[in-house]
Amino acid sequence: MEQLTPLIKRFTFKRQDGQNFPRFSGGSHIIVKMNEQISNAYSLMSCTQDLSTYQVCVRKDVEGKGGSVFMHDQCNEGCEIQISEPKNLFPLAETGNKHILIAGGIGITPFLPQMDELAARGADFELHYAYRSPEHAALLDELKQKHAKHVFSYVDSEGCSLKLDELISSQPKGTHVYVCGPKPMIDAVIDCCNKHRYRDEYIHWEQFASTVPEDGEAFTVVLAKSNQEIEVQSNQTILQAIETLNIDVECLCREGVCGTCETAILEGEADHFDQYLSDAEKASQKSMMICVSRAKGKKLVLDL
């Protein structure tokens, strides 16, 4: 473990059996299971060529679900912890005239291995890294040592902000834009790309924090296999409601990114808030992630 900033720690994992971890590509994440109630997704930031270890960075958030506090306060060197195999929902495009990477705060982590991959390809790329103040600039020195001419940093506390419209509008045709960071930054980048007529397939983003509205409408869920009916409250997920019936549903992340709780929809329409299903899969209304997604109407019938 390494304390990078007052709020950010880097964790290095090794397998108990001494074997290498599975291969992964830049942009991949793993699910770290702290206990039966808490599992969080974290981007892998280690070198894709060195599989002897996996590395992640965790920013302590005392107002979060408890996972980051657990990692900071209870995870010590030598402790055992369960992690999933890597999955990549934020891969680099195989082609493109240029790649613009935009990071906010801890959102820098998936870009470390991606920058190595782009450099190895000989691709044209830039990283634009925005952070609140110098003490929040985790990994900036490492990035500049490896990719100095590709890294541009912006410090809010010093009055240096990212001029997003200028950046997006000045790129050549065929540029891919990637963003990872706080939701307002992601929304701003997507809106700016749309304004300048970037095609959807050239805009890539990742955010692990839930985007589910805090004040949703209550609705009814019918479990077809067990012939049970439950009421999902406005401040409750379908998964949480089902768990009150002691029905076991596998779910690792509880954030709509891992896909383990995907459930078939037999009747009704889902309001999708996950990052796992494609837009086409969401539109088909064949399945949903019950850890974050909700009903569009008053009733859903699920294949459970």
UniProtKB/Swiss-Prot annotation:
Full protein name: Carnitine monooxygenase reductase subunit
Subunit structure, as described in the record: Composed of an oxygenase subunit and a reductase subunit.
EC supergroup of this enzyme: oxidoreductase
Domain FAD-binding FR-type: 1-93
Binding residues for [2Fe-2S] cluster: 253, 258, 261, 291
Its EC number(s): 1.14.13.239
Any Pfam family: Fer2
Biological pathway: Amine and polyamine metabolism; carnitine metabolism
Catalytic activity: (R)-carnitine + NADH + O2 + H(+) = (3R)-3-hydroxy-4-oxobutanoate + trimethylamine + NAD(+) + H2O; (R)-carnitine + NADPH + O2 + H(+) = (3R)-3-hydroxy-4-oxobutanoate + trimethylamine + NADP(+) + H2O
Annotated keywords: 2Fe-2S, Flavoprotein, FMN, Iron, Iron-sulfur, Metal-binding, NAD, NADP, Oxidoreductase
Family membership: Belongs to the PDR/VanB family. CntB subfamily.
Entry annotated with the keyword Iron-sulfur: yes
A molecular function (GO) term: 2 iron, 2 sulfur cluster binding
Cofactor note: Binds 1 2Fe-2S cluster.
Cofactor(s) named in the record: FMN; [2Fe-2S] cluster
InterPro entries: 2Fe-2S_ferredoxin-like_sf, 2Fe-2S_ferredoxin-type, 2Fe2S_fd_BS, Benzoxazolinone_Detox_Enz, Beta-grasp_dom_sf, Carnitine_monoox_B, DmmA-like_N, FAD-bd_FR_type
Activity regulation (record text): Inhibited by EDTA.
Gene Ontology biological-process entries: carnitine metabolic process
Function as written in the Swiss-Prot or TrEMBL entry: Converts carnitine to trimethylamine and malic semialdehyde. Acts on both enantiomers.
Domain of life: Bacteria
Domain named 2Fe-2S ferredoxin-type: residues: 219-304
